[in-house]
């Protein structure tokens, strides 16, 4: 915790100051642009104002939301004297790519343990970039095997005199995402203010529980009326809401914030996750095509395509009012396009 406890609501300056007390390594090209998408809105038949927060442009190995997260994660690793970063994530992970790049920038070794089967052919997408960056890549059939491999590798590295840091081994891995995206929310609020606009009526983000905790933290801390809508790349069975609340509470404790009992307006969409993680669906493909052809903005088939499909679905169901201001936080992940060329071919026209 940092200093005396502050009770919500707090000011933007107070929240920014609390975040600024935490160790952090500057990495992201921030502030990222906030772009209005009027042609996209017209294509959806709405007069709502839709903005995209371009966190696909954070820099570092094709950018994405993990660059902001890594500002806090890397600071913690360096504070622990790490010379080797170990990360256990999924085989398509954007986090793996960005972590490997950041490790190179700081002279650290990067070891990835990925859940999934090693490709029989040449690597593609994020995995190709992981290899280009020189990350040491291991594969595991499931999460228990992944954890066992991480523990074994960390032990071997320590025995060899190295200083391993298993990034996914503590709650701070998720809390760092909340801190990063509370800060990003402050950034986009400032950009909206420059346009003469207040807090958005709704904010959409791809998340299964970690990233969305940041906007939730900011909304609760500042007392914003914003609906925070997360869209998962997989069906979480409803677990994302509880996971986000837990991460939000942990991050608030680090900041010394008492958020009280007022819940943020968190809505979660699991229905765009099927047929599963790493797989796409017609709604995501439609979203990719519609945003590309109306605004020239690219989405991926696994994360951001599904998130924008959730936004499109809400507009069509009347959940977005005609006078509302909506922000979609673009979390990147564009290398995944090249894992799904066969899925994309039928919609190219």
Placement of each model-derived feature along the sequence:
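PLP-dependent amino-acid enzyme catalytic core
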Residues: 1-349
């Amino acid at each position: 915790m940092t200093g005396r406890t502050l009770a919500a609501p707090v000011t933007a300056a107070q929240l920014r100051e609390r975040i600024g007390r935490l160790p952090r390594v500057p990495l992201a090209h921030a502030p990222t642009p906030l772009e209005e998408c009027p042609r996209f809105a017209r294509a959806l038949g709405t007069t709502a104002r839709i903005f995209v927060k371009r966190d696909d442009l954070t820099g570092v190995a094709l950018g994405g939301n993990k660059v902001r997260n890594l500002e806090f994660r890397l600071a913690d690793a360096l504070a622990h004297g790490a010379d080797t970063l170990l990360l256990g994530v999924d085989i398509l992970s954007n986090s793996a790519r960005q972590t490997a790049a950041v490790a190179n920038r700081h002279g650290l070794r990067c070891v990835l343990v990925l859940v999934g089967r090693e490709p029989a052919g040449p690597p593609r997408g994020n995995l190709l970039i992981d290899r280009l960056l020189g990350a040491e890549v291991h594969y595991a059939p499931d999460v228990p095997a992944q954890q066992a491999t991480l523990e074994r590798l960390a032990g071997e590295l320590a025995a060899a005199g190295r200083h391993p840091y298993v990034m996914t081994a503590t709650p701070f891995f998720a809390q760092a995402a909340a801190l990063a995206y509370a800060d990003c929310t402050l950034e986009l609020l400032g950009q909206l203010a420059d346009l003469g606009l207040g807090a958005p009526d709704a904010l959409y983000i791809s998340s299964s529980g970690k990233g969305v905790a940041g906007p939730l933290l900011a909304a609760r801390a500042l007392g914003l009326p914003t609906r925070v809508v997360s869209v998962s790349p997989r069906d979480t069975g409803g677990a994302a809401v509880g996971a986000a609340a837990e991460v939000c509470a942990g991050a608030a404790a680090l900041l010394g914030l008492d958020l009280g009992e007022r819940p943020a307006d968190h809505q979660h969409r699991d229905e765009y996750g099927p047929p599963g993680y790493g797989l796409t669906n017609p709604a995501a493909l439609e979203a990719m095509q519609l945003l590309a052809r109306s605004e020239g903005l690219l989405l991926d088939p696994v994360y951001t395509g599904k998130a924008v499909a959730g936004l499109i679905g809400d507009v069509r169901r009347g959940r977005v009012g005609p006078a509302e201001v909506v922000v979609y936080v673009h979390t990147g992940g564009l290398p995944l396009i090249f894992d799904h060329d066969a899925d994309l071919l039928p919609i190219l026209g």
